[in-house]
Amino acid sequence: MGVSLKKLEKSVATIELTIPSEKFEEGLNFAFKKNASKFNVPGFRRGKAPRVIVERYYGEGVLYEDAVEYVFDEAYKEALKTFNLEPVDYPDINILQIGKGKDLILEATVPVMPEVELGEYKGIEIEKIEYNVYDGDVEYELEKLRQQNARIVPVEGRPAESGDIAVIDFEGFIDGKPFEGGKAENYELELGSNTFIPGFEDQIIGHNVNETFDVNITFPEDYRVEELRGKSAVFKVTLKALNKKELPELDDEFAKDVSEFETLDELKADIRKKLEEKNRVEAENEMKEKAVMKVVENAKVDIPDVMVERQIDISLRDLDYNLRYQGLDLNSYLSITGKTLENLRKEMWDGALNRVKTQLVIDKIAKVENIEVTEEELENKLKEMAANYRINLEEFKKSLTESQINSIKEDIAYYKTIDFIFSKCKIISKEE
């Protein structure tokens, strides 16, 4: 058997395979035995005609397809091994020569894993990013704590105001008919929170407890229930009760109630410390992102289109998955935005290309720098994931397939390599 690499351009390989005539004859015999029962030749019972008669009656080419398939796989695998190629899709096969008693010559064209030519990835200059924590940030967090620890007390002697918590019964009607999901009792709604249908909360303000009234709304065009989008509805609403939040005083007693600290100043100091750490991590992640962008820009790699198309497929599946949490799906999203699937795929192309290139470059650096995942790192990641899923660690491990474990290890290696790149960066202060 002979193999030759005719060309390798833009990560698409064209390989010529020469299969000896005797090997192809073996394939023809295999094809005949496989299909013998299908041949119906006059003068012979079905499946009993000799091969020479079958070829004369149907034509010599009747066995070619299965014969080529029989001999191709072995020759193709040998060629990939010889030229150290890793295919990323199925090959297109072109027959250059075929015939009884002749060597079979095939041409296989296949996109392969691209070779990455790394540029500079050590000593990358990155401008330092810092986020300060201001007094207002601390006060904002304190106010959130107050809201979380507020007492709910009844409102008496006045109509509803913004900020009140209204307890309502309601039933919605479209064209005078009730609709599914449009009815509730003892529903708590904070007025002014903008968490309900637009315009609904505003029309409760000014009404008194035990009052029944109409609320007129129009459902938004992007409403989660497709059947209700853009439709006008009338809700019969009864205001059953009004409550409000009574916020605790910001003092040492408050600090003792909501934390392990004895004084408000200690609580403030802890909040500031946590915000500073949060900002440090956020700033570091942004610098890492900028470093990776520069490293990827410095690298050269010809990426086959099929790898980008597959990344777009993944992005579309993720988009559809997230849309379903909002009561939508990909088709309804396309309808709302007025886009076609083809247009959306085109919009996603550049982002998908960058994601594929980034992954390839990071993988190459990991290989060059011998960055590997230790058993301890894998164990720690599995512990973290099990804790997040609130499942026993051993049970979680047993639930994972080998493919899933490999995927987790790849993620660890990916971020470990990014940490390596960042550790080699030169951080430049803005003043420099």
Swiss-Prot record:
One GO biological process term: protein unfolding
Known catalytic reactions: [protein]-peptidylproline (omega=180) = [protein]-peptidylproline (omega=0)
Disulfide bonds: none
This enzyme's EC code(s): 5.2.1.8
NCBIfam families: tig (TIGR00115)
A single cellular component GO annotation: cytoplasm
UniProt xrefs under HAMAP family: Trigger_factor_Tig (MF_00303)
Name the UniProt record assigns to this protein: Trigger factor
Family the entry assigns: Belongs to the FKBP-type PPIase family. Tig subfamily.
Chain's role: Involved in protein export. Acts as a chaperone by maintaining the newly synthesized protein in an open conformation. Functions as a peptidyl-prolyl cis-trans isomerase.
Keyword Cell cycle: yes
Source species: Thermoanaerobacter pseudethanolicus (strain ATCC 33223 / 39E)
Keyword Cell cycle (UniProt): yes
Matches recorded under SUPFAM superfamilies: FKBP-like, Triger factor/SurA peptide-binding domain-like, Trigger factor ribosome-binding domain
Notes on the domains: Consists of 3 domains; the N-terminus binds the ribosome, the middle domain has PPIase activity, while the C-terminus has intrinsic chaperone activity on its own.
Keywords for this protein: Cell cycle, Cell division, Chaperone, Cytoplasm, Isomerase, Rotamase
Subcellular location: Cytoplasm
Residue ranges constituting the PPIase FKBP-type domain according to the UniProt record: 163-248
One GO MF term: peptidyl-prolyl cis-trans isomerase activity
